Each structure stands twice: as C-alpha cells, then as structure tokens.
Amino acid sequence: MRAAGHGRSRVVRVDRGERAVYAVAGVVTSLAGALGRRRTHAVSKAALMPLLQVGLVRDRRLSPQGLGALLGATGAAWVGDLVLIAPEGGESGEASRRRLRKGAAAFAVQQLIYAGMLVQAGARPRPRSTAVVAGTLLGLAALDTAKESRPDPVVTAYGVLLGTTGALALGMPRSAGDLAIGRIPWGGASFVASDAMILLGEQVLTGRAAQAGHGFVLVTYALAQRWLVDGLAATARLKPVE
C-alpha cells in the first residue's frame, strides 16, 4: 500500500511540475510576443507543444490510439507554431500572408484530429454555440475578403475546421467529477478567440493595439492547447493510475 501511495504522489508531483513549466513558457511566450522580444518569443513558443507532448508520453493511462492522435495533433501544431513566428528582420504583407497560409495548413491537421476525437468522445454541436461560432467566423471571413478582394482558400478551409472543432468543443457533454473534460468547451472557445484575433491583428490593428492583440493571441492559444489536450487525453484513458 505504501509503494502504491508513493507512486501516486510522485505522479502528482511530476504532473504539477510539467504544468508549471508549461505555464511559465506560456507567460514568457505571450509577454515576449507582445513586447516584440522576437528571439525569446521564438524559443519559448517553440517549446510549448513539446512540453505538452512530454506529459502525454508520461501518461500511461492513455490508450495507444489516443496517444498517437494527440501526438500527431500537437506535432502539427508545433510545425504551425514555427511557421507563424515572424522573421526578425520583418517581411512584406505578401510574405506574411504566405506564412499565414502555411501555418493554417499545419493547424488544419490538428483541428481535424481534435474534431475526430471530440466526436468519438460524444461531443455534438449545439444550435446556440454553433450559431455564435459561425457568426464570428463569417464576420472574419467578410473582413478578410474585403481586404484581400477574394476569399483565401487555405485560410477559409482552416476556418471551417476551426469552427467545427469549436462548435464540437462547446457541445461537449459534461463529465461529473472530471475537471479536464469540463474545460474542453473553454479550450474550444479560446482557440476561436485566438485565431480571430490573428486575423484582426493582420487586417485592422496597428501599433500598440497590434502588440496587445498579439499578446492576447498567444495567451489564449496557450490556454486553449492546455485545456483541449488535457480534456481529450481524459477521454482517451483506459484505466486509472495504479
């Protein structure tokens, strides 16, 4: 009994340590991004998904399918994170749009995996939350089209997947006693808010408002990933820790 109890306490300590490191990396990423500290921002942002992956690999309760899916999703997000880090010397608007398309393509893979896992976990879109998500994305699409003169097919396709994941997450049934699953709706909402601000920052915001918007993008992104990965991992576990 002592050995089992000691093992459980060690798991809890490790889990808390990993969460603390991720939280620090998220704060540093957000502040560095808002303040224009590009090198610090690049290093800390590149560490976010690997930190989540460490926790996933250490979680022996995860099913092989769940582990593989979440590693694939966070791996795609890591590629997207690297692509979306702005170059230190600045870039043209056209180059920024190309970078946005590449990032959207990588994150589309993640959203597809998340949506599939949510459906498997019993999530279903609800009319009210779906209407809110759809209205938000349609408004952003209209803004983007007005600025770019025609819809961007890559960004539009990503927006559809993002909206699907967001609506599913907001429709996730509650699980009594499981806080991680209960945070899935918050993760979906945060992801939509984060990506909405990316487009607003590109099309509308300038100066200090753009910097503040960038900080908002990063903090909501870090929270969204934490909540979604934790929640989806909870839906994919086979057995409790012994």
Give the ranges of each region predicted by the language model.
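Short amphipathic, positively biased membrane-proximal segments
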Residues: 1-242
